[in-house]
Amino acid sequence: MSKVSKTAMPAGAGRGAAKKELPEHFKSYKHVWVFVELERGQVHPVSWELMGTGRGLADRLKVNLAAVVVGPEGQHTRNAALEAFCYGADLAYLVSDNVLSDYRNESYTKALTELVNTYKPEILLLGATTLGRDLAGSVATNLSTGLTADCTTLDVDADGSLAATRPTFGGSLLCTIYTLNYRPQMATVRPRVMPMPARVMRDAARIVVHPLGLVEDDIVTKVLSFLPDRDAETSTLAYADVVVAGGLGLGSPENFRLVRELAALLGAEYGCSRPLVQKGWVTSDRQIGQTGKTIRPKLYIAAGISGAIQHRVGVEGADLIVAVNTDKNAPIFDFAHLAIVSDAMQLLPALTAAFRARLLPDSRARIAV
């Protein structure tokens, strides 16, 4: 169904004779769709990030960009469809029904599958969130098409095929994957992998309302109660402007307090590399990298982190990366903007003291006394 290039290559490279003529019944599939994730009345930011990426793909293909909004009847759902036009949508598809009040795989899969079969997009993008991953897999299965998960780059090749690049083999390789002979071409992207596009006020264009035709008795799964994710309420790591993170170079779990102290002083979020989660030093909601969170802060300070590719793919969107490591050959220095060869155990307290003196001059006076 999907073809994988063995190494990261330019879009379209390495396919050769493997590409077959697209079956006739798929040639009518046109346009780029982005699924707008709406939960508890709020649009997940990854949806707007994907709208920016989708806009670029649609422009290169010379087709329309459409937003797909699925949710309960009411103003929140319609507002999400209207807001999509401010992020580049040419039209929006709206499925609004009270059986969609809570996310359930059965009802949402039916809604999105029906939309695809009726209006036939060539590309369908979803956020790689808990909801998006669950929905994308079931929709791709229903449609018997390919799905590339957790992409880091999306492009179109000279033939107009979607070239979806993602890490593989534990992050040691980047593979470009094509869904050659099936439609739609589906991909998911994690939050913060793509930049947030500028919001531009635009008049609403066309909204296509599609009836669901599903009643509550048709759905096996019932939602009895909703418990908010504790981590989602207490951590804003993925969308923080400043992030301080630590790795194994800190030496012990007790020393991780140096990361927390600097982050607290800067009003920043703190994170860590995967080994610290594996050792139980830090909870998994603070992990940064391929299997954790992707971040795009204005400033990222990495202390005692080697910078393997699994970590790199989660941080390389940062505006400024400051890396601290005792090993001058550490991989993180290959992509850091500022490399400091030093012991994090000595540098972090010095940085904290310097920032405290600069940001809190009263504390400097008290120390002098």
UniProtKB/Swiss-Prot annotation:
Keywords: Electron transport, FAD, Flavoprotein, Nitrogen fixation, Transport. It holds the Pfam family ETF_alpha. Gene3D superfamilies: HUPs, TPP-binding domain. InterPro entries: DHS-like_NAD/FAD-binding_dom, ETF_a/b_N, ETF_a/FixB, ETF_alpha_N, ETF_asu_C, ETF_asu_C_CS, Rossmann-like_a/b/a_fold. FAD binds at residues 299-327. One of its GO terms (biological process) is nitrogen fixation. GO terms for molecular function: electron transfer activity; flavin adenine dinucleotide binding. It comes from the Bacteria. Belongs to the ETF alpha-subunit/FixB family. May play a role in a redox process involved in nitrogen fixation. FixA and FixB form a heterodimer. This is Protein FixB. It comes from Bradyrhizobium diazoefficiens (strain JCM 10833 / BCRC 13528 / IAM 13628 / NBRC 14792 / USDA 110). The lineage of its organism: Bacteria, Pseudomonadati, Pseudomonadota, Alphaproteobacteria, Hyphomicrobiales.
